[in-house]
Amino acid sequence: MESTARKERVRYVFVGRVQNRGVRFACVTCARKEGLTGWVRNERNGTVTAEVQGSSTGQLAFLRRLSTLVPGFGDNWSVGSEKPVSLVDDERDFGVRRY
């Protein structure tokens, strides 16, 4: 169903205690579980950025799953910003990038 749904791509910036807590691994796990593509990386300023591409339903499920998989959502870490960005053609997987 993901292939027929209208795709969107969103850049999320996660803030708070997000590095060295498994956030990148959790993003990969959640995105793949929802059939989403994109990437995630640690930033030098201590945040974690992810670009996630797929249906709006998949995006919501990704965030919901992520908030339960990484302890402390709302108290120790949160979504600092989310911004629509351009779609990436022919992207097939979700992975970790380096800055």
Q: Could you describe each region identified by the protein language model?
A:
Residues 1-99:
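Intrinsically disordered, low-complexity, mixed-charge
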